[in-house]
């Protein structure tokens, strides 16, 4: 719906998808890019089992449900995601969101089980969504996915409208 509601058409339209394709990103590189966000905050690298056991590319030999999800299989020792990653901006955001869940699992893995449930069902989702809010134009520029960061009133309003349509409309 954003394309028909964009307040200032064409202002600060960031074509991250084009950059991902032009730079030869694949499912693994996109996942590693999302992981690098967390390691840049001082969090540990994901365990090798994450990459061995996660489904990030749609298998050609069988049907799977491609809805993205994060899993804590063995009390934080075998975190996984299931996401049929496509090379586009939305999927890059979804990877950051899903890895938000994974890092949350990793951070509470040593807590007693009574403390592993969220205070509210929406809390876990809020963790992932908060991470996506950090995917600012400055962040995308540092990752080499955009050339310039346009700072203007119009660009700010467009970004806020897009965010409102993607996130705020779905709040309970």
Please report, for each region that a protein language model flagged, where it lies by residue:
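Cation-handling catalytic/transport regions enriched in His/Asp/Glu
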Residues: 1-172
């Amino acid at each position: 719906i954003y394309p028909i509601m964009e307040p200032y058409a064409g202002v600060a339209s960031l074509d991250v998808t084009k950059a991902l394709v032009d730079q030869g990103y694949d499912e693994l590189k996109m996942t590693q890019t999302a992981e690098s966000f967390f390691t840049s905050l001082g969090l540990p690298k994901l365990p090798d089992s994450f990459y061995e056991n996660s489904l990030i590319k749609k298998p050609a030999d069988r049907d799977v449900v491609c809805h993205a999800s994060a899993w804590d299989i063995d009390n934080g020792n075998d975190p996984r995601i299931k996401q049929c990653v496509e090379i586009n901006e939305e999927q890059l955001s979804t990877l950051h969101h899903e890895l938000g869940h994974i890092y949350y699992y990793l951070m509470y893995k040593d807590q007693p089980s009574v403390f592993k449930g969220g205070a509210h069902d929406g809390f876990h989702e809020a963790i992932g969504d908060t991470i996506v809010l950090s995917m600012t134009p400055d962040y995308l520029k540092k990752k080499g996915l955009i050339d310039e960061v346009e700072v203007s009133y119009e660009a700010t309003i467009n970004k806020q409208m897009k965010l409102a349509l993607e996130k705020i409309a779905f709040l309970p």
